[in-house]
Amino acid sequence: MKNNASIALAAALTTALTAGPAISHNTFTAMTVPAGYIQDLEMRVTHGCKGSSPVNSVRIKIPEGVTRVSVNVVRDWKVETKMRKLPKPVPGEGGVMITETVDEIMWSAPKSMIPASGSYEGFRFRAHLPN
């Protein structure tokens, strides 16, 4: 059951990322992750396909049940987060109750686009995964 939830999480993140103005080849670095743990996750985005626009923004929708999200800053990209209220508070570090979590992570406006030469950009974040 835990592996199924982990695979579903990876699929949800990948699907959310590819919906955007440019089509690119994306790889989620962790296909299975342990449920109930805090995990470092990365979406690797390559160049836009031939004939499509260059990749100039990346959006990741965080699925329900994922809490305590922190975002890695990608050099030369602007990062923003959109928050959502949790249905009920969950315990965080030091006994502090968490009442909201990141709903979406958006990286945009890079100083230079991802080149089409087989390179990629990694968009990382850390999240507490559901059980």
Regions found by a protein language model. Give the residues of each.
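Bacterial N-terminal signal peptides that target proteins for export
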Residues: 1-8
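Bacterial N-terminal signal peptides
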Residues: 10-16
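N-terminal edge beta-strand
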Residues: 22-45
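Beta-strand-rich interaction surfaces with strong enrichment in secreted/lumenal proteins
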Residues: 29-30, 94-95, 109-115
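Low-complexity, serine/threonine/proline/glycine-rich extracellular segments that form mucin-like
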Residues: 39-75
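A surface/secretory-pathway sequence property marking extracellular, secreted
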Residues: 65-103
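Low-complexity, intrinsically disordered segments enriched in Ser/Thr together with acidic residues
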Residues: 108-130
